[in-house]
């Protein structure tokens, strides 16, 4: 007997092992059948089967599984398997969710039958698993069935493996499984039978299956279909056409395959550069892609239809998706090629072979399907009653809530739904009332769409089927029983009652809003808001608004400081309306729908337009109360659509920094000086608040989680009930956001943050905010900056020959805070230009300038306003005033109007605009135009007129006309706080003579008004009308000019000269091609104008610097001696080709000519002026490193670069001039020697070149020898020395050599390396020669310095052990969103930084204590916020670049050379070294001379270090995956919103045609009813627009988060290397990264604080709304 028992045990163990190891569905069922037969077990005995099996199988491998299952079955909720003892359940579908539900029901004691249509598990598609899902499956013994389950950092599994695993567990716990069985329909009980008669059954195929005779109490649909079970209405979520392709390739498990990194995914909005390169190289256009490695190499991607058509995958284009993707319309061979090519590119061609796996049909495993529409059931369960028999019907899995595949939520949410359903069935078995049961289930179901891995309970051990253990803050009674009465179907209800009851699920707030908010109520509200205003009498919604006063009054009521109502002229209707439109767009984010001119038409404004436009004000300020400052404080909580500035205006302010193209001008905006001063001040406040804040580890993590939670809730609510109040809670507090928010995201756009007067002599004395205390490091800068400014002012004062410049400077120096308000509030007097004779005017101007300078010194805190100065100035002259004429060719243009190209007869020339401020600066780039001067010309600096008030002084003599125009413009600046640009008198005269003063002309009149689409020239109806940059267009017409992709408002860039819009990627390409084209047409030193570009938020003007033939030397001196924080240099626009060809213009200037000086002076500003803010930020954050004064020659820029935003821009970059590249042969330097430079520039007045990423364009043609070329700056320890500048000219062949990464020069010796090391106190990095220590210019010295520079550059490349690997694998610091991509500019980037920052960082040794105290204030936690700069600026050809910015396990190539003696600042940051990532350990540090010394040395703590690295990598990967999924959600939601908007627009167009009688209607339709319908559509459209803005805000936050994570990872990797092994450039790069992180933290801090404030407001409003609803007898619920 003993032997028999032992044999029996051994046999049982072997049979059970066979069952466990089965790899197919059929094999598993067969092994299970054999196991039961051999062990004499009855699988139909569901109650005792598990116990019998556990008793029979006792071998050691099974005991671990029994222990896990026993622990699970021991949960109290199961009541030891008796909770549902008499319940019979049918589950339709054998997917993961169906089996998971079956397991729970079996543990509850229910009889469970699973029917599955197929008998094979063939889907190799990979599922992403949430942490709780992994924990749950492990507790069920997943490792026993599949040993590779989630090994290491793997968090995914193929559907086939998961199904097999769950099938085996289900069989073990007594679930009855039938395959090859198809559900057909429910069979109702016979009507005439007793209570113990036949119950509910299922009709199945084949009919002879035993399941057809079973009766059930519960039926669960889990087959993933949408119509298997009747009674469940569905909500559709339609996005843009989305065609998914899945592909499975054979995984041979080779070493090469194992090394290929998985790709968690890339969303188009997250890494556009990758997709652009993919399209350019392969023609494949994708929106996202994922790669997982399991039994197969699994790829899934979303392809764009046009790409599939172009590649021949889809044969014919059809509108119907079914026909489009029909089998006979798909070329299978092309599809295979398409997917393989995308997979090859995505893995960087690292997979050795891509052979398709074979599916169960014997075909290559690739599929293409449509998921344009996703569906969700409106309810999760219902109860049917027939003949006194009740049946509970429920849905789980995809049948309940279809997932968006890139998110990986299908399995996770499906399991949660399975647990919730099991909980419901337990209540059903215990006799709970059906309505109570359904109401609880619906309450829980409403949480499901918004669940994420972050917002569910983290205590996985406590998870049970009880929802309270899984959902924090669960409210299981938010849906009341009476609200689900329609889900109890007894056959006594008719369809109409069912439909009516279904409406009870709608939000109370929405219903009340729709019943109360009508056009009549809108009119009444407008009347109440505008009463008691002069000239305003609102009696209707059209003619009453014609004058524009009513709109201005409406704005003034809400924000009195925005409009000076008393100064408005009632007769100037167009101006008043345009003013209101501009202010509303700028301050409230309300896009205009028409123009001021059209409002002034005889027929008056269109009523439909006014309803649409005024409704936005109504929603924003409805029943808002005024605070003392006139800001709205509260919002009517009963209005679900009331939302604040947060959604629209906040997003606009965020994107101000994102725009690369400043506008030429805007009306009624702050002056350039004011705006830049405030930006500087705001930056210091943000920076110091960041520095003085406590360590941000916990704080940032909390904020990050809050933001993520807010985003999730927002998206989920929208997903759950598309048009209902899901949007409301995220956007209810718009109107009061300004009053309470601590700091605006972009303080430059908000006049309330204007700084008080900032004197030129005291630029560092800015008033403190309540929240901010100046850092001691900032104080360290004050004396330095003040001394620089004083020195500069004295220098400027000593120049007496050029006076008008100083007058204008003084005007610009006026009070920052008062300039804006005074210009807005004071009445605008008519402009009276004077025309005195030339000599008296100049004499008076000189006298006045001297008086102003003296007064500025004596009374720095009591200066006169601009207006007073202008009045005094005008009083000094005599003569008959010339009456101004309005130039008909330059009509008023709104701030949103697009700046057009400058007329060829009109050329603007610009001079420097001093703006004293501690921090600064709008990037301003310049090109020069060499104009032929007929006589001695004095340069005059004037401020440009606002287009709406530009004057053309009559046809008087040119000199008098110019003087009159000068005074007119000067006086006008008192009321036009636009960006100051400067005009030379020569150009002003030309403008006056031609009758053109406007900088831009209105778009061609042939394009029509606001009802004509600027792109397609077709009619654009009101509801479908969008506006940007003053243009009006259809949504579908708003596309990138290059790639044709759809653009979104706020996420576009605009070229003001060409009148074209671009996406981020192609705007950068546009800049590149523009510079290349300009370079090709340059000739003999003549520079063509740089493109003037603009965006929809920036207001920078185009500034220019003319280069006349004969300029006074004082002019050049004035230009040189302006303080570094005051320089503005820009473009002189010349389009007349005849001028370019003028021999006098093209002739090179003599060495000592003033023209040459002006050229050099102008070029200095081209680089430095863009970078002032950068320099100031660095000096603020790292004062001990960067405070010491140094001087350098300013590089002159041959390359025209575009006017860009300041250093705060998310898209910051600087395009490095060509000469930053070093020729391969230093002998070419002989061709680059410039003429002698007589100019001298004091050190303290030259801004330092800041930390900027560089991009070098290789296509520039060879410039002429007379063209000034940029030079790399030199550094000297002598604080008063001057730097002569030399030209650099490169031939085309030399440029090509520079782009050869494999370039080596064995001729370079180690002696040259030593030369650089000897220049330790002041590293000399020059093009031409060492800098002399005396101020006088010197003749060109020998080539020693330049040769040394070139050698050093070459050494940095040749030292790497593998230059090709360096190109391919080096992380791209300059392109943070595509770290692996190859960037030509990176070749020269580090040397540029070395020339600009190493000298700063090493000007003197720093103590570790000094820097440590500074850096302790910088939050660098691993989970703090992330920030970014744009990665679209440089788009070079792809050179084996890596796949995504989300990669983790990059293997770094060889690094650059390591200079000796560079042991400065970052040596104290060694505490970060233990956090270094695995990349650093894999990085080979070697050079040609000391490779052995550079080898990484393993220490005794190597094992511990590796363990920490693995943990860090896993955590980083997890964080990246979370960001990816959130990005995918945002991307999908944006597409859905766009589709909903398009649907609304179609309805609105049809309705508008009816209202206008364009559809042939006889007019019998009730207009009032139609207007009511129109208004409802308007409200819905406004709501969707706000939601879209909110989604873009969250996308911005996500981008910042991702970038900061990568910056910190890069910093830790670098700090793992000892400082003694680093070169100077590497130390500088570490400093750069640190500053980058600080900037990102600042951005995210602001954004997070604003979003958190918004959340708190919404929470309070929700409580008020709930109280209101309950007090009025409504049942409170959210939908």
UniProtKB/Swiss-Prot annotation:
Q: Where is the composition biased (Basic and acidic residues)?
A: 662-674, 697-707, 1133-1143
Where FAD binds, per the record, is at: 97-125, 398
Q: Which reactions does this protein catalyse?
A: L-methionyl-[F-actin] + NADPH + O2 + H(+) = L-methionyl-(R)-S-oxide-[F-actin] + NADP(+) + H2O
Identify the coding gene.
mical2b
Which residue intervals define the domain LIM zinc-binding in the entry?
Answer: 1011-1073
Q: Where is this region: Disordered?
A: 661-772, 818-838, 874-907, 1073-1163, 1194-1247, 1259-1283, 1302-1342, 1473-1509
Motif Nuclear localization signal per record, residues: 658-679
Start-end of Acidic residues biased regions: 1202-1211
The UniProt family comment states: Belongs to the Mical family.
Query: GO BP, one example?
Result: heart development
Which GO cellular component terms are attached?
cytoplasm; nucleus
- Uppermost EC category: oxidoreductase
Which prosthetic group or cofactor does it need? FAD
Q: Which PROSITE patterns match?
A: BMERB (PS51848), CH (PS50021), LIM_DOMAIN_1 (PS00478), LIM_DOMAIN_2 (PS50023)
Question: Which segments constitute the bMERB domain?
Answer: 1517-1667
Source organism of the structure: Danio rerio (Zebrafish)
* Entry EC number(s): 1.14.13.225
**SMART domains recorded for this chain?**
CH (SM00033), DUF3585 (SM01203), LIM (SM00132)
- Where do Pro residues bias regions lie? 1333-1342
Q: Is Glycoprotein one of the keywords UniProt gives this record? A: no
User: What name has this protein been given in UniProt?
Assistant: [F-actin]-monooxygenase mical2b
Molecular functions (GO terms): actin binding; F-actin monooxygenase activity; FAD binding; metal ion binding; oxidoreductase activity
Q: What does this protein do?
A: Nuclear monooxygenase that promotes depolymerization of F-actin by mediating oxidation of specific methionine residues on actin and regulates the srf signaling. Acts by modifying nuclear actin subunits through the addition of oxygen to form methionine-sulfoxide, leading to promote actin filament severing and prevent repolymerization.
Report the residue ranges that make up the Calponin-homology (CH) domain in this protein. Answer: 516-619
Q: What broad class describes the main subcellular location of this protein?
A: nucleus
Annotated keywords: Actin-binding, Cytoplasm, FAD, Flavoprotein, LIM domain, Metal-binding, Monooxygenase, NADP, Nucleus, Oxidoreductase, Zinc
Show the taxonomic lineage: Eukaryota, Metazoa, Chordata, Craniata, Vertebrata
